[in-house]
Each structure stands twice: as structure tokens, then as C-alpha cells.
Amino acid sequence: MLDPKLLRNSLDEVAARLKTKRYDLDVDAFSQLEERRKSVQVRTEELQSERNSKSKNIGMMIKQGQDPQPLKDEVAKIGEQLETAKAELQDIQDKLDDLLQGIPNLPDASVPEGASEDDNVEVRQWGSVREFDFEPKDHVDLGESLGLLDFNSGAKLAGSRFVVMRRELARLHRALAQFMLDIHTTEHGYQETMTPFLVHAHALQGTGQLPKFEADLFKVPGEHDFYLIPTAEVPVTNLVREEILDAKELPLKMTSHTPCFRSEAGSYGRDVRGMIRQHQFEKVELIHVVAPEQSDAALEELTGNAERILQLLNLPYRVVALCGGDLGFSAAKTYDIEVWLPAQKKYREISSCSNCRDFQARRMQARWRNPETGKPELVHTLNGSGLAIGRTLIAVLENYQQADGSILVPDVLEPYMGGVKVIKSAN
């Protein structure tokens, strides 16, 4: 959530910056609510002061032997007016809060201008794209020909955008998750964290998925207000909700391997083939909670940590800076990491690394105690995939495929595969 003071003091400037994110702020609606809020707040304070003053006079009248009843009646009437004003003020504040909850984060000054992903700016590339002496297959043809990737069974169990993995491929998927966690915890200093896969609505509000993106979520019917998590960003970041962290606890770096559940409501017709866009997938998430002055460096570090996984797997990739029009709701700045997929002959997103500044922290009231002031201040939060496991599996299948349809196991994964070096058809 944006700082309400910033909106009050620089409304036109904020509106102009939000336009670069393809968001039109309703300036008139905010201004009208804010004027009403100020007017009713002044009225409330005046009534409170008047009631307090007259209440004191009641005691004086009693001491002087005067009849206080007329003044008591007047105080009671003022009290009724005060309660009405307080209720009106709360109603206005609720409307302002609802409006604020729907306003996205402001883009950093360093974010490239642009309207869509076509305007994103490449920052760097790593690795050499492999030259095949045969026509490379996509992951669907490879997995199905090996008898290890089964979309028909996934559809039988749950419908479209689900898959069943078998034998060596299921093990390779598990190996990737373990490998990522091992690197992030032993080399990069993250705390491994296990959280619930179900959360209440307030957790999703804290990280910005609610109220704007409810259609993208799976809600569990019943007496509990539960949603399936769309990313581990939600439960892990919310661990600092309504907390005041000590300065020595920062930076706080956490990693978590979870399933993720998304309805893909806005993705009809996109990536319908294969595992690129699934309703259920797994991901290793990276979370940083930092002091404000640490967040610029933290974004570079987090992105580098995600890149390290691809480097160790020897998968070519590039990093792009998202333009304003392609930024997510809560992000102030984002780097996407895109891995090379030979069958598509292009780079595809495998990680999105974002600095949310104090946007999520304000929604969650996540703070740290600044030793210089001794006062609680909002932290900055960052998140990124380190990596999406299904998409990493796709990249391994396509980049390590052989002419006979077999798949070489990357060297770094062999210890997790029980010495299996090549994945072949069982037939």
C-alpha cells in the first residue's frame, strides 16, 4: 500500500507515475473522500472538545449547588452527535482504505518506460545457446516418448493444465528442488522455511494478491476463510506481519519449497501445451526482509542467487528489466530471468525477482526498530523464484536432449539421482 501522506501531498505526481504502470488513479474520488475525511475529522474533534469542556462544567455546577440536568442533557446530545460523526469518519476511512488497497506500487525511477513485455530491456546474457545437429523436440514430445510425462492422466484426475510425472522424471523434478534448496541454504545463506499451503485472506492482502487478483486464486469452500497459496511469497513474507524486528535480525533471508496453485484466469489460450502454465506447480522461493538502505543491493543479490542455479545447471539465460507497463502490482522494480528453450527458439521466464520497497510492509505493518532513532519503521521486502521447478525441468529436458530422445542428467544433479547419468525410455 502506498503511503497515504504521499497521496495527500503529491497526488498529481503519484497519478502521473502510476500511468507508467498502466494504472489510472481516480484523482477526483480520492480528493473528494480526503476532503470529506478532513471535514468530518475536524467536526469530530470539535464535538469531542466541546463535550469534554461541558462535562467538566457539570462537576463545577454540582459543587456550586446548581441544577446540572440541562447541561447533562446537552452533553448527552453532543455525545450522540459525536458518535454519528465517528461512524461517518470510519465509513469514509474504510472507503479510503479500499481505494488504497487497489492502488499498485510506484515504479522506481530506474524502471524502463514501456507498455508491455515488448518494451522490457535486456540487462545481460549468460551461457552459449547449443547448436543441435538434429531438430530438437519440445519437452512434451520428449517426456511422452520416454513414457515419463503423462498429460492424459493429469486431465483424467483434475482436468486441463495438470500433469503426472513418472519414475526418473519424477525423481529429476525432486532432485531439482533439493539441489536448489541446498545451494540457497549452504552457499547463499538462506533459512529454509516450511509454511502452510493454505492461508487466510489477510495474508494475501498483505502481499498484494487481494483484493485485486481474487480471480487468479483458488478459494477453499467451507467455514474457514482459506485460499491455496499462489506462491510461497505469501506465507513466508507474512511471517513478519505485525512484527517489529531488531536491527541485528536484518537482512532476513528465507527460502521455501512449496506447491503453488493458480487459476490462470487471464491466460485462456496461452501456453496450453505442456507444463509452461499449470494450475499446480512447484517453486523454490527466495524472500529478503531488509532495512530500506539495503534493498537496492538486496535485489541484485537475490537475482544473482537465482541466476547461480542456472549457471550450475549450465542452462543459457538472459536477465531483463521489466518496463513500467509490465511490472506486477506490488513491485517497484523487477528483473525477469528467462531461460533458453531450444524447441521454441526463444527465452522464456523462469524467475521474477522484485523489490517491493515498503509497499507490502505497510499492508502487513512489518517493521524494524531503527537503532539511530529508536523508533519502529517499515522494512523493505523482496521476493523471487529460485527457481520455478517445472520450468527448470523443461529447460533441462530440452537443452540436454540427445538425438535418440534420451536426456543427459546435468553433472550437479547426478548425486541426487542415485548415479543415473542418462534418462532413457523404459521400453
Curated annotation (Swiss-Prot):
Give the record's GO biological process terms.
selenocysteine biosynthetic process; seryl-tRNA aminoacylation
> What is its subcellular localisation?
Cytoplasm
Q: Which Pfam families match?
A: Seryl_tRNA_N, tRNA-synt_2b
Its transmembrane ranges are: none
- Could you tell me one molecular function GO term of this UniProt entry? ATP binding
Main subcellular location: cytoplasm
Entry EC number(s)? 6.1.1.11
The catalysed reaction is: tRNA(Ser) + L-serine + ATP = L-seryl-tRNA(Ser) + AMP + diphosphate + H(+); tRNA(Sec) + L-serine + ATP = L-seryl-tRNA(Sec) + AMP + diphosphate + H(+)
Which pathway features in its UniProt record?
Aminoacyl-tRNA biosynthesis; selenocysteinyl-tRNA(Sec) biosynthesis; L-seryl-tRNA(Sec) from L-serine and tRNA(Sec): step 1/1
Q: Recite the UniProt keywords alphabetically.
A: Aminoacyl-tRNA synthetase, ATP-binding, Cytoplasm, Ligase, Nucleotide-binding, Protein biosynthesis
Question: Where does the chain bind L-serine?
Answer: 231-233, 285, 385
- Provide the binding site for ATP: 262-264, 349-352
GO cellular component annotations of the record: cytoplasm
Q: Which family does it belong to?
A: Belongs to the class-II aminoacyl-tRNA synthetase family. Type-1 seryl-tRNA synthetase subfamily.
Q: What does this protein do?
A: Catalyzes the attachment of serine to tRNA(Ser). Is also able to aminoacylate tRNA(Sec) with serine, to form the misacylated tRNA L-seryl-tRNA(Sec), which will be further converted into selenocysteinyl-tRNA(Sec).
Domain description: Consists of two distinct domains, a catalytic core and a N-terminal extension that is involved in tRNA binding.
- Fill in the subunit field for this protein: Homodimer. The tRNA molecule binds across the dimer.
The protein's name in its UniProt record: Serine--tRNA ligase
Q: Which gene encodes it?
A: serS
